[in-house]
Structure formats: C-alpha cells, structure tokens
UniProtKB/Swiss-Prot annotation:
MF-aspect GO terms: ribosomal large subunit binding
Gene3D superfamilies: 3.30.1360.40, Ribosome-recycling factor
Any one biological process term the GO annotation gives: cytoplasmic translational termination
Record's protein name: Ribosome-recycling factor
Natural source organism: Paracoccus denitrificans (strain Pd 1222)
Compartments, as annotated in UniProt: Cytoplasm
Lineage top rank: taxon: Bacteria
HAMAP family documented for this protein: RRF
Function as written in the Swiss-Prot or TrEMBL entry: Responsible for the release of ribosomes from messenger RNA at the termination of protein biosynthesis. May increase the efficiency of translation by recycling ribosomes from one round of translation to another.
Keyword Cytoplasm attached: yes
InterPro entries assigned to the protein according to its UniProt record, in alphabetical order: Ribosome_recyc_fac (IPR002661), Ribosome_recyc_fac_dom (IPR023584), RRF_sf (IPR036191)
Family to which the UniProt record says this protein belongs: Belongs to the RRF family.
C-alpha cells in the first residue's frame, strides 16, 4: 500500500455517523405513547419576534410516563406556546395551569402504531440513502486516486474499507429501526 495516496475514511465515517445521528433525532420526535422531553424539541414558538424552540422559553419535564410539563418562564408567552403545541401536529391537547403547560400523552391505537412504524421505516430509509451517498463519494475519491496513479491493490483495499464501513453503518440503522418499531408496537 503506497503512502502517498490515501483515502480519508475518517471523514466518510464522520459523515455516515452524522446521518445516523440525524436518524436518532428523527426517531426521538416520533410520539410512541411514552412521554419524552425530545417530543417537544421541534416545536417553535413565535417569541420576541422570532421563532424560538420551546425548550428555550421554558423548562421541559417528564414527571410521569404519560405526561410532559413545560414551565414557561415568561407569562406573556404561555398562549403562544400553547398555540404552537396545538399546531405542531403531535396530536396532543395541552392543558394550562398558570405558567405550566401540561401535555397528557394518550394511548396509541393499533392503527396509529402501524402508521408510526411506517414513518420510522421511511426515516431509516432516508438515513440509508444518506449513508450510500457518502459511500458513493468515497468510491469517487478512490476512482480519482486510481487515475492519479493508485495501484489496483490499493484501490481494492480502499473499496473494501469503504464498503465495510457502509455495511456497518447500514446494520446500525437497521438495528435502530428494529428497536424503534418494537418500542412503538409495545402496548
């Protein structure tokens, strides 16, 4: 293996892990019937003239398995936060208690559970595509290096390394999807 031509597999791995992290974030936003502070992370509230994440205008807590509470720090933003939650598409009806917004998480019916597993599968497929795109970029780097004088043995080595990394990341996507689907279908 020649020292002068090397493929940056660390960069490829970092980009693939970024796709995996994005998948974890998308999975966290799925409402599975269990309360979690990450459910409300994507909700933006029109606060002080600009969209602000709800967790930056109040404290998000999970006091019970089926309850999320948000203690809004500024009384003037309680109504806007409640409106943002209603319009978020979470399907949760917020209840007000002073500056505290309570979000009771209802049980999911079978149809909704199946729908959420399909959504989770779509998220996983997007992550797989992103990982394959990174793989393609790596293979393109190898082709450029081959035209710059990389030996055929080195080319095979780097192609194998990139493919091995891709297979490992795709397997972790599949594993995360299995775990998420099991969590969603659990009654």
């Amino acid at each position: 293996m020649s020292d002068e031509i090397e493929i940056d597999t660390d960069d490829l791995e970092r980009r693939m892990k970024g796709a995996m992290e994005s998948l974890r974030h998308e999975f966290a936003s799925l409402r599975t019937g269990r309360a979690s502070a990450s459910m409300v992370e994507p909700i933006m509230v029109d606060a002080y003239g600009s969209p602000t994440p709800i967790n930056q205008i109040g404290t998000v807590n999970v006091p019970e398995p089926r309850m999320v509470t948000i203690n809004i720090w500024d009384k003037g933003l309680v109504g806007k936060a409640e409106k943002a939650i209603r319009e978020s598409g979470l399907g949760i009806n917020p209840q007000l208690n002073g500056t505290i917004i309570m979000l009771p998480i209802p049980e999911l019916n079978e149809e909704r559970r199946r729908e959420l597993t399909r959504v989770a599968a779509q998220y996983a497929e997007h992550a797989r595509v992103a990982i394959r795109n990174v793989r393609r970029d790596g293979m393109d780097q190898i082709k450029k290096a081959k035209s710059s004088g990389m030996s055929e043995d080195d080319q095979k080595f780097w192609e194998g390394a990139v493919q091995e990394l891709t297979d490992k990341m795709i397997a972790s996507v599949d594993q995360a999807l299995e775990a998420k689907q099991a969590e969603i279908m659990q009654v």
